[in-house]
Amino acid sequence: MVLAGMQSGRAIAADFTPDNSDAIIRWNNATLEAISSSKIAPTSSARAIALTSTSMYDAWAAYDPTAIGTQLGDSLQIAAPNVTQQNKETAVSYAAYRTLSNLFPTHQNLFDSVMSDLGYDTTFTTTDLTASINAQTEAAITGNLTAKALLDYRANDGSNQQSNYAGTLNYQPVNTWDNINDPERWQPISIDGGGTIQENLTPHWNQVTPFALSSADQYLPAPPEPFLDADGNLNQGFVNQSLEVIKYSAELTDREKVIAEYWADGPKTVLPPGHWQIFGQYVSQRDNLSLDDNVKLFFGLGNAVFDASISSWDAKVHYDYARPISTIRYLAGNNLLPTSDPNVRINADGKTEIFAWGGPEQGSQWILGTDWLPYQDITFLTPPFAEYVSGHSTFSAAAAEVLLQYTGSDDFGLCHVEPAGSSTFESNTPGVPVELCWDTFTAAADEAGLSRLYGGIHFKDGDINGRAMGREIGDTVWAKSQYYINGGKVPTSVPEPASILGLFVGAAWMTKQRMSA
């Protein structure tokens, strides 16, 4: 069993054992371990995954007769006699080690331990290829050099890594934790009466340089539902999306609770971008992929979640849209929810009550609408950034698209069993073991998006439009990764997906042919 993350001390797992003998998988797991034990945002975790997988790809590209690196192009070309499995492993390991040491300096012992297990000298830091005395030192230098080139390029990419990814745009919320000035806009939440108030997480992320996107807003979706319609009246679409979340909350089954919790990927987990790296590891094992195969797979997969982070955060910052916890409480507090809905009523005091999940171990019951809680860990009620679009949906759809393109099929075939009573959101849930199975990558991505409605975190539009964005992003990243892998033969300027279906199919076919050659 491989850990897909830690949440409140409990492992959320995908039920298979990864092959840590493969260098790419080994370093992918080291990346996920660092993420799960760090206080890190989904955005910066996606960047860490992308940089690590890209640095390994760049080192590997020097050993491939066709592929070119993302930073040094084809200027590094190792002589054929030195192109061995051992030397490739050395090169990608040094590249990953240098990259991760830069990204997670407080986890140096973890990365040193991996290098020690692999038998590599961490003090060998030279980037001068003329200093190589044999093929093994040449490989180590290649890894050091390609990692340095990538890190130098990314040092000023807009992420603000040097200041722990702190926001750089002086974002100020329109609403306060205890007062809503604009019901459409994001509200910071406090779970302790104002003692600790959410701060918007990485609101500058749309300033980060993407891997494949032409701009952060390349796939910006249409606006979400406004509070008022064109005539200045309450927009029923705004109300209806909140009623839909209330309905999900009222009717939560154990299976839906498991789905909400399995996909939550909150603090102390590998987060949503890391979840799909675990799925990539499963595909690697399922298809018996080699190091050459894995480096190409994770190159695309890592950059898919990275560009998804930039694009989804651009939408979040652009629209600054409210979360369900804010809209439901606001509409209820102002008696704006219709009593014609079976889950809404006015009590004897003239206040709006809703029939919904009442909190841990409370089941569904009539509660004041202003007290409504999403089905989440009580210490992490709702994420500290805007609703629209769903990051989960965007990350998942982008990753699923790359996995589909890489394998040439949507077939997935992974299952996970959640034991009875394993929930950390409430005790005795689920009452019996619940098995989650995903026949296709698309089904897994769709469930990840839907889980956010079960959990009361997102509205349907945020999910559906996030999925649509994710698929476009996945296609764009796939094409860009093939450009590098195929030696610059795939266009970097990607047209509309419908017009390049043949390109994607052809690129997938070429990749499969090279894998089987």
Which stretches of residues belong to each language-model region?
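C-terminal segment of classical bacterial N-terminal signal peptides
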Residues: 2-11
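Short alpha-helical segments used as structural interaction elements across diverse proteins
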Residues: 7, 44, 449, 509-511
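Acidic/polar surface patches and capping/hinge elements
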Residues: 12-491
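A short, hydrophobic C-terminal helix/tail in secreted or cell-surface proteins
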Residues: 493-512
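Short, charged juxtamembrane terminal tails flanking transmembrane helices
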Residues: 514-517
